Amino acid sequence: MKEIEIRELKRVKLNAPVMIEGLPGVGNVGKLVVEHMIEELHAEKIIEIYSWHFPPQVFVKDDGTVRLCRNEVYAWSSPKLDLLILTGDQQSITNEGHYILTEKYLDIAEKFGVSRIFTLGGYGIGHLVEEQRVIGAANSPELVEEMRRFGVEFMEEEPGGLSLIHI
């Protein structure tokens, strides 16, 4: 296997899609959200990504055979909005692998002319919270203001993981 193998399952044309990433992480929040989106929208799997940066594990399929860990990209299109949805089994097991895989994810985004990327993930604070909220980070003041209009909160000096590398 190559360091990263990208298998294109189907070619699709999208118009300046928005990319949404939800990989396993704290509480599997991002993964659960995008899996729900994929199911509700009937998004179509178009890419499989394999890498030796994923844990050396296999998953047992319904028929009893196994498959390697992988991440996947789904596409969905409507007259008003096109989406690319990135999800999968694992994140990288190394710090270096996070950056290498992120570069490939961004290559995919560039190939499709992605207009914006949102990454989703949980935020561990060490205890249960009474009131849930959405905490964000962005790469421009304009995007911060736009997200604030939707109730997203921003916290100074907070660390972030892979879900923030993509932004």
Stretch-by-stretch model annotation:
Residues 1-89:
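N-terminal short beta-loop-beta anion/metal-coordinating cradle
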Residues 65-163:
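Glycine-rich phosphate- or other oxyanion-binding loops that anchor nucleotides, phosphorylated ligands
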Residues 165-167:
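Conserved small/polar residues in nucleotide/adenosyl-binding loops
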